[in-house]
Amino acid sequence: MVDVLGGRRLVTREGTVVEAEVALQNKVVALYFAAGRCSPSRDFTPLLCDFYTELVSEARRPAPFEVVFVSADGSAEEMLDFMRELHGSWLALPFHDPYRHELKKRYEITAIPKLVVIKQNGAVITNKGRKQIRERGLACFQNWVEAADVFQNFSG
C-alpha cells in the first residue's frame, strides 16, 4: 500500500468508493495532477488513458499499476466531467479531500499536467512520467517496476 494514501478513500469515474490500501496494494502508483480546463492536461490524458488501458485493462496479465488522479479543477463538477470525458478506469482522490493540497505541496507541483510515479513508501521514482510516456511509451513501465523494488518479477 502506498503510505502517502494510507487511510484514504478513492473514487472511480462512476462514483464507486474504494479503500486506497486495497486498490493500491503491490502496485506502482502514478499520481496524476491535472485539470479539465487545462489544454495540456486535455492533450496528455488520452495518451495516459491508452498507456493505462494497454498495461492494465487489455493486458493478458494486468500490470501492477494504478493511476490516482489529483484534481486541480475548480469544482467537483468540473472534476467529474473531466473524468467521465477523458479518463481511463483509474482512481481519484475525492475533490473535497483537503489532502489534494498536501500532495501538491509534498511533490512540488507547480504546473499541470504532472505525472509523479511513486514507490510504496511515497518516494519518487520519477516526476517526469508524462515526458517518459510521450518519449518511450510502454517501455518506461519496466524501469518504474524495477525502481519500485517490490515488483522485480514483472515482465510486460
Swiss-Prot record:
Top-rank taxon: Eukaryota
CDD domains associated with the record: TryX_like_family
Biological process annotations from GO: photoreceptor cell maintenance; sensory perception of smell; visual perception
Pfam families: Thioredoxin_8 (PF13905)
Tissue: Both isoforms are expressed in retina, in the photoreceptor layer, and throughout the olfactory sensory neuron layer of the nasal epithelium, in neurons. Also expressed at low levels in brain and testis.
Gene null: resulting phenotype: At 10 months of age, mutant animals show signs of photoreceptor dysfunction. The progressive loss of cone function is followed by cone cell death, while in rods, the outer segment length id reduced, but not rod cell death is not observed. At 12 months, mice present a stronger age-dependent impairment of fine odor discrimination than their wild-type counterparts.
InterPro entries: RdCVF2, Thioredoxin-like_fold, Thioredoxin-like_sf
Domain Thioredoxin: 9-147
PANTHER family in the cross-refs: NUCLEOREDOXIN-LIKE PROTEIN 2
Family affiliation: Belongs to the nucleoredoxin family.
Full protein name: Nucleoredoxin-like protein 2
Biological classification of the source: Eukaryota, Metazoa, Chordata, Craniata, Vertebrata
